[in-house]
């Protein structure tokens, strides 16, 4: 090779490597409180993946770079808001029949914004998603209360199709969690014996806590829970705990699904039972607010 061409080829080759490395780095969304972080990333094809909810992380890049060593066509990607469609085999957060009868929904990233609200203790992140084939948009709202270590979330579903669509499932939140074990604590009861405490070690498969009793729900099944991570016994003095509560007085459902990779996917929101909702063209639907907190103390 001509000596004058060698530096040129070397420069071009190194440039391609650098460009490829830069392109491979995912866009990171890190929602933070004083003591916790909720970390997501955007893949090269626009999927928004969920990576972490736990202790605060200031540099989230290493978390998003952890490889799962499993094929994406297994249908178990940790999507930030799962849908019925594509290769998702988990219980979906959103299930829709579109105006043309199609039931496939695949959401992709459009943009996201983060701003501080009037109360400087509070920041709000909005992630905008759109369907790959239909005129359907979803906005995910995350509001972080720094001092309280609380993050609330809800979804807004917007119909830009020419006709009405039907919402079959419209959960407020989809939260994938990875640990060795999961101990679920929740409350149940009846008249004169409300707020009984129940502890359940989650195994592979699904467990649901739900109510179909309309406005008189919480004295039988309460729309709140705690998940103790990496422990098979409940202790009030130590351990990692994720707690959640749904700000909704009607029919609700909390679904806990542990898959074959030992990932726990938590769905929380209004109960989809007998709740099909027709959303007209140009209309939007806002889900109830889901409240999360994390503690390791």
Where are these regions (language model features)?
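Short, Lys/Arg- and Gly-enriched loop/turn segments at beta-strand edges
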Residues: 293-297
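Bacterial N-terminal signal peptides that target proteins for export
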Residues: 1-9
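Short, structured beta-strand/loop micro-motifs enriched in basic residues and often containing a Trp
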Residues: 261-271
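Boundary at the C-terminal end of the N-terminal hydrophobic targeting segment
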Residues: 20-24
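Bacterial N-terminal signal peptides
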Residues: 10-18
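Polysaccharide-binding surfaces and accessory modules of carbohydrate-active proteins
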Residues: 25-39, 47-257, 273
């Amino acid at each position: 090779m001509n000596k004058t061409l060698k530096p040129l080829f070397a420069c071009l080759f190194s440039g391609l490597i650098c460009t490829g490395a830069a392109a491979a780095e995912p866009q990171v969304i890190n929602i933070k409180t004083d003591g916790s972080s909720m970390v997501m990333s955007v893949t090269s094809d626009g999927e928004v993946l969920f990576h972490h909810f736990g202790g605060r992380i200031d540099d989230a890049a290493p978390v998003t770079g952890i490889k799962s060593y499993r094929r994406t066509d297994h249908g178990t990607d940790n999507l930030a808001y799962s849908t019925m469609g594509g290769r998702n085999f988990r219980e979906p957060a959103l299930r829709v029949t579109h105006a043309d009868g199609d039931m496939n929904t695949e959401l992709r990233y459009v943009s996201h914004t983060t701003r501080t609200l009037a109360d400087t203790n509070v920041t709000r992140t909005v992630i905008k998603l759109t369907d790959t084939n239909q005129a359907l948009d979803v906005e995910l709202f995350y509001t972080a209360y720094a001092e309280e270590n609380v993050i609330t979330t809800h979804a807004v579903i917007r119909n830009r199709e020419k006709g009405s669509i039907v919402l079959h499932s419209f959960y407020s939140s989809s939260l994938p969690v990875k640990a060795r074990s999961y101990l679920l604590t929740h409350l149940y009861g009846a008249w004169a014996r409300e707020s009984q405490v129940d502890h359940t070690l989650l195994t592979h498969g699904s467990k649901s806590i739900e109510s179909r009793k309309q406005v008189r729900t919480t004295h039988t099944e309460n729309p709140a829970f705690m998940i103790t991570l990496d422990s098979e016994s409940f202790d009030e003095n130590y351990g990692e705990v994720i707690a959640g509560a749904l700000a909704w007085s009607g029919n609700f459902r909390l679904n806990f699904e542990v898959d074959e990779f030992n990932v726990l996917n938590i769905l929380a929101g209004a109960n989809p039972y007998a709740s099909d909702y027709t959303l007209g063209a140009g209309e939007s639907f806002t889900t109830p607010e889901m409240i999360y907190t994390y503690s390791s103390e």
